[in-house]
Amino acid sequence: EEMTTIITDLKETFRRGNIYIQLIYINVAVFILTTLTEVMFQLFNRSIAGVFEWLELPASVIRFILQPWSLLTYMFMHAGFMHILFNMLWLYWFGALFLSFFSAKHLRGVYILGGICGGLLYMAAYNIFPYFRPMTDYSFMLGASASVLAIVAATSYREPNYPIRLLLFGTIRLKYLALIVIGTDLLFITSSNAGGHIAHLGGALAGVWFAASLSKGSDLTSWINKCLDTLVSIVNFKPRKPKMKVHYGTGKQKDYDYNARKKAQSDEIDRILDKLKKSGYESLTTEEKKSLFDASKR
């Protein structure tokens, strides 16, 4: 019963939460589920890493053709506790700031758009540059970093001079924070986490592209939100209950009842009229007078 209450509370918090809170919930839920599954398999000396690769984004184009859904699923997967912790902290801080200037639907759209653009740039780089080619066949990417960087970049483009307080460095303008993050990714593009840094750049470009296009009246996330709305409506579909109850097969019985009732009423009126002729109006009872009056109105 206690567990049921906890699950109910979590569902209610998710339902009432802002979009960035909902995205954090989804990421954390996926992380817990995949981690618990991995632990269970390890207890029996089994590895499930190969299964999870089908949810991660491969650098190999041939492998990607076999698992195209990974362009969406990879942005909800994480490699460890610190990986998801920092991504979710950034999503929490900048998700709230993003909503000061854009809508909730824009945020979920930019999250997906940033992840897609980051993933595509990662695949392109690994298949174009000779430096990455030896790693292409066995490289996989996962994490929400590109999606989060898209949110940071879009907010930075919209409000470049917004003051951000940093614990050790004091207050700096948002545009400088974004430039530091992007600059770091450029410097470490050939590091051991090359795919992640490339994806960050793709996400950041997507965020700037979105904000710049929106300022000119074009919403790059509209198609994403249409797809998501359709998906949500399918998941939440409930057949509409009929407003009226319809009964079949009883028509003859109902006609018979109706006709019998009409005949009884007619016989009663005939009896009252006969009494009226013989003994006059005053001889009728109150009930008979009422029946006669009702019949005259039909």
Predicted regions and their residues:
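Terminal membrane-proximal soluble interaction domains of membrane-associated proteins
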Residues: 263-298
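A detector for small-residue-rich transmembrane helices and their helix-helix packing motifs
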Residues: 1-264, 268, 272
